[in-house]
């Protein structure tokens, strides 16, 4: 059979490193995996207990609502009021998604079609590129990186784009670059969207992972933002529920309703016991994200300190669960994919090559803070030995 849409997909670069890691492990080599951003921290005991209780109730095994149960939508809007001072209507401005990734993908089907264009940061989380492409739209890349003014780059890309993009995709704190913005930036981008009649989609996956006094702003904190924007929030990192697949689309009521309508044709939502437990987690353990944040900060400090002792100076990120590291000068010519392969072979450490996040990621590797401090310390010792040996 001819799977034209599937056959058009390029090789998934990040899978190359995963394959090397698995091959090494089959040979008995202990590879420390800092490549895949797969949170290792468990959710709260209360959430797990509530899930177990809900699973035992026969009524909870029927189809759920694709929009999400009312109490869960109320819980997320209550969280936004407490956390960000944002008032949202749980009936019209909130829709539950099966994780932010599913929500974003289907949202692109709602907002874009053939002949449309979306502006996306480069580098970017892969679905931010492939979501618009799957919807039939074209991509306009906007350079994002150290010593880059993203807003100036966006203006330049806008002027060079015709037809004008219909959607701008944002995600701060940013994966993979860890770039952060303040509320003043959000105000500027909202003003731009109003002036140029473009719609904003903000993937707020790392809403609760800010360090050293930095508090990531919600785009919906800007007055009137819901006229031109929606935001995706997820429990994956904040509440350590990666495999539970609980996310939300929030903001513009017309767009939220459109996504809910599309989802009614595609799914029946997340398993209801998971929705019930997620509701309890947000309502009864509101400080849990602070505990998660503290763990990731300690891991960040351990990795940054260990890399420095290895002679690899990397700026400490203010947000996310990642470290975006420039390739050391002696290895720059290798490129990020070959350098990441070298780290697996010589240091027994897996990192994601920057090119896997688009051409704008070349010259960097991304480390995920998904191992405990002891394992991270061992990883940096391995890196130091390998880089010293290779000279």
What do these predicted regions represent?
Residues 279, 296-304, 314-327, 361:
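Conserved glycine-rich beta-strand-loop-beta hairpin in the small C-terminal domain of fold type I
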């Amino acid at each position: 059979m001819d799977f034209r849409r599937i056959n058009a997909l390029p090789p998934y670069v990040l899978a190359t490193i995963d394959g090397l890691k698995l091959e090494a492990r089959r040979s008995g080599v202990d590879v420390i995996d800092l490549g895949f951003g797969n949170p290792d921290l468990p959710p709260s005991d209360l959430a797990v207990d509530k899930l177990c209780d809900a699973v035992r109730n026969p009524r909870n095994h029927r189809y759920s609502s694709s929009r999400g149960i009312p109490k869960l939508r109320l819980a997320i809007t209550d969280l936004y009021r407490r956390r960000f001072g944002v008032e949202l209507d749980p009936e019209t401005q909130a829709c539950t998604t099966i994780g932010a990734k599913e929500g974003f993908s289907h949202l692109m089907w709602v907002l874009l079609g053939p002949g449309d264009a979306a502006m996306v940061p480069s580098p970017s989380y892969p679905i931010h590129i492939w979501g618009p492409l799957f919807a039939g739209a074209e991509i306009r890349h906007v350079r994002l990186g150290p010593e880059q003014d993203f807003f100036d780059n966006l203006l330049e890309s806008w002027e060079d784009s015709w037809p004008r993009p219909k959607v701008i995709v944002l995600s701060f704190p940013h994966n993979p670059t860890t770039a952060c913005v303040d509320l003043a930036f959000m105000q500027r981008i909202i003003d731009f969207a109003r002036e140029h009649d473009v719609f904003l989609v903000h993937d707020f996956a790392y809403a609760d992972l800010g360090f050293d006094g930095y508090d990531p702003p919600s785009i919906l904190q800007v007055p009137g933002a819901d006229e031109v924007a929606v935001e995706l929030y997820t429990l994956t990192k904040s509440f350590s529920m990666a495999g539970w697949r609980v996310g939300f689309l929030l903001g513009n009521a017309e767009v939220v309703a459109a996504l809910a309508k599309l989802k009614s044709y595609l799914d029946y939502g997340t398993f209801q016991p998971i929705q019930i437990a997620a509701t309890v987690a947000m309502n009864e353990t509101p400080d849990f994200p602070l505990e998660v944040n503290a763990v990731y900060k300690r891991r960040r400090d351990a990795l940054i300190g260990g890399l420095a002792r290895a002679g690899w100076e990397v700026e400490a990120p203010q947000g996310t669960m990642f470290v975006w590291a420039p390739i050391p000068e002696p290895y720059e010519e290798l490129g990020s994919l070959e350098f990441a392969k070298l780290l697996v072979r010589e240091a027994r450490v897996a990192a994601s090559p920057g090119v896997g996040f688009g051409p704008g990621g070349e010259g960097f590797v991304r480390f995920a803070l998904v191992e405990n401090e002891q394992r991270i310390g061992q990883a940096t010792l391995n890196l130091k030995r390998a880089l010293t040996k290779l000279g």
